[in-house]
Amino acid sequence: MSIRFDSEARIFVLETAHTSYHMKVDALGHLLHLYYGKTIGTGDLMQLYPRTDRGFSPDYYAYRTHRGVSPDLLPQEYTGCNVGDFRLSCLTVADSRGAFGADFTYVSHTVEAGKYQLTGLPCAHAEENDAETLIVRMQDEATGLTLELLYGVFAQQDVITRAARLTNHGDTPLRLDKAASACLDLPFGRWDLLHFHGRHAMERQLEREAVGTNIQTISSVRGSSSHHNNPFLILCQQDATETSGACYGVMMVYSGSYQMDVERSQTGLVRVVSGIQEERFAWNLKPGETFDTPEVILSFAAEGLTPLSQQYHRFLRRNICRGPWRGKRRPVLINNWEATYFDFNTEKIVKIAEKAASLGVEMMVLDDGWFGTRNDDNQGLGDWVVNCEKLPGGLDPLIEQINALGMKFGLWIEPEMVNENSQLYRTHPDWALTLPGRKPAMGRNQLVLDLSRPEVVDYLAGAISKLLREHHIEYIKWDMNRSMSDVYSRAFPAEQQGEIMHRYMLGVYALAERLTQGFPEVLFEGCAGGGGRFDAGMLCYYPQIWCSDDTDAIERLTIQHGTSFGYPVCTMGAHVSACPNHQTGRTTPIDTRAVVAMSGTFGYELDLGKLKRAECTAVKNQIKRFKRLNDLIRTGDYYRLTDPAENAYFTAWQFAAEDGSEALLNLVVTHPQANPLPIHLCFRGLKEDAVYELDGIDYFGSRYAHDVEDGIHKGMRFSGSTLLYAGLVLPQLFGDYPSVQLHLTRKG
């Protein structure tokens, strides 16, 4: 059993392979958080929190005559509001009189096999009985509000998931102005916060800063998890590295506006509260109604950032991603967007596909512009019927020609949006989110459809399902190209307008559920102007997400590096694009572009017909190499060997099979130097006592100052310990952005 309860001491212990999570019901019935970290044995953990009378930290009423028991000082599992804890709260609730307050006490608990599920929200699932569930029931007597704290314990994964379920068992309505998913109080000490900020075309840039005495907030108010901050953070010891130091991860399974707050208290405790963004949130909870919060995924690693990342990678691959595509190699695709933009017809697309097929590409994806009057981004969104001027005869003649080449066919959609210049908007202007009496802000010339309305979800499900039923479409790229503003729904009364942004997200999830369950063999790829909705919530429906609209290989190094802290490479959409690059104007060798894109789903986004003969040969070889290495890249352990933001010379990363049978080292020189220092690297994830052969050395885009006779060469053999601790030195690399791939195979 991974969940134990000591009824005498009233202590819960959740255990995974390498961690312990301890909670205690105190004398007043409050659920206290005692410990989360490396596995420990028995012992009185309340001694960590001795009774102390601190000025201006009020005591519970029961302790008013012998002070020192204050909610402001105790570590708590889920905090109420306005009852004496002045740190971050999980909940703000008002009763029908306008009185704010909640103080939850223990009622009962149950332990169940398997994993809890949430109503209308994506969450982790159990595989082969690899999870247990703890439900702790608590009650606020004054309001009749019941709180169920949900814990999913994945023992072998070293993961604990959490969510909260709130039910109004009182006689009058309540209003939730804040409803966080989880609170985590961490022990005394100095901590660093790692978070992943950015902007469009420059997502998930790692930033590391000390946890101070202020409140540090990572959030989005944009209606999506956003390009600007990712709903994932790490708290680690200040001296933690990739291979040492205690590290805690907190990841939300949510794709809408969210908020993750970190606060260091007056006594040095650090509290993390994660949940739905409280700005513009107000949920009415009538008697008998229940509200589920989004899920949070917690993980702890005692030995650095790399094992923490690997725990998340395995968990997301196994217990977040679903459907037949999660464990399969994805087809190598070509997308026409950067080759044609809106200017295409059947002949152009077939010509691109013919060249791609001759080089080994497996799928042709038709991007934006195939529907309605969509000749630019001012019109057509919402009208999911084929533009027969561009595609005479519709989609079927094009698909038949693509399939005749031995290729699959995929299609771009953006179901959540509408143009004012569209038949859908002219028919249903009330289906767009706009404020009464105001001209709305426009993003990419489009408005957001009101997916809080079931009839809008039904329309979209019907229109997209019709496309998938009537045409042989094997891939869908689901885009979302603006942030939400002017949020107001004409389907709900004034008192429910604070529910709309969350109801919108529930509508998106309902639509994604209907489409992915209705067409399980279709490969869905998420997108939101690139990586604007790259989160665990969307990964429950799509096994891959377009990582960024920035396809520049050198820029992608920092984007994919930051993404890798929480998300596996098999979820990162990555393509080889044209040069000069359309976002930066940079020219990079085509093989270096491929080395970077291979650490993702791998595909192409350019007109292959414009390549030179040598580049076409390179593309053929890239595809063969990717297919050969894909199992290792997709399922192997990922290691960050350098930080591209700190190492101006080169960026290196590595994959190793979990059983240590093979490894792949990748390196890109980002700033070639005269008379450079040696490139010295040690491998990771190998078996010390094994023997490995260097059976693949590929240098791309480089020029050598001279031959190195005594350097590394193909066929050399090394012990695992030599590669792990002595390492290898690579030859000097010159030219513009050269790259290297080294492959090792275990031979004994």
PLM regions and their residue ranges:
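Carbohydrate-binding surface patches
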Residues: 242, 644-687
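C-terminal beta-sandwich/jelly-roll accessory domains of carbohydrate-active enzymes
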Residues: 671-748
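Glycan-recognition surfaces
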Residues: 419-458, 502-609
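Short Pro-Gly-centered flexible turn/kink motifs
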Residues: 101-106, 283-302, 737-745
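Glycine-rich, aromatic-flanked loop segments that form ligand/cofactor-binding clefts
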Residues: 72-73, 77-115, 242-257, 300-324, ...
